[in-house]
Regions:
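Amphipathic alpha-helical interaction segments
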Residues: 9, 29, 33, 51-55
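Intrinsically disordered, low-complexity regions
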Residues: 19-22, 41, 49
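Polar low-complexity intrinsically disordered regions
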Residues: 14, 30-34, 63
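Short, charged early-sequence alpha-helical segments and their helix-coil boundaries
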Residues: 43-78
Length: 78
């Protein structure tokens, strides 16, 4: 199970990742990229890593929507 703390850390990671990075990867590569960055910040056991992998996969449409919204906002402010 993904703990609330892990969720907060993941979403902070998504917010701190450049939009171009979030949009450049295919789905499976983006999951692995985010998981690798998460593990670099905090050690997690293999079972939690699997839960987090599944959670990220389920949230990919939302992650991409957020990235696209951030991109539109950034382009609109220039």
């Amino acid at each position: 199970m993904v703990s609330p703390n892990m969720m907060r850390q993941l979403w902070a990671l998504v917010e701190s990742t450049q939009v171009s990075t979030l949009l450049q990867f295919e789905d499976s590569d983006l999951v692995q990229f985010l998981l690798k960055r998460f593990k670099a910040q905090q050690s997690i056991d293999p079972q939690d890593a699997r839960y987090l992998d599944t959670y990220i996969q389920s949230k990919l449409p939302l992650i991409r929507d957020i990235a696209e919204d951030r991109q539109a906002i950034n382009q609109g402010s220039h």
